[in-house]
């Protein structure tokens, strides 16, 4: 959490009481790689991903209300915050990416589908608990392995190479 935007987002999101809300993805793992590389902690962070899970209303309008709520609460941070209800992803994913996507049961299920195992990290906004089902060893060591739960070799290799282009010391296994 060396990135001050991460810390501030966690505080502000907690106050919004969004169900199963997690700060996740590049804003977390890139801070670790940036620290090791001597880069500013926010170097290369394009956006700040927020996953939540609310299956009580699966309409786009309901998700848009949460997106707007977060946008208003974080507007002064100067950071692009991407908010997605993981309960809805199966409704639009196949149409957008031409591949099926299972109906999820928890916000963490979305994190579990990341292509690179060590990037499967998130912070539960309500509890502050770190979710890292693969541990942190590979993340700290810069070892990129395919996620065994989502073994798409072509997409994994493209994503891993993209990371390695920015942090050349990363190793693809």
Region roles according to the model:
Residues 1-173:
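Catalytic cores of the polymerase beta-like nucleotidyltransferase superfamily
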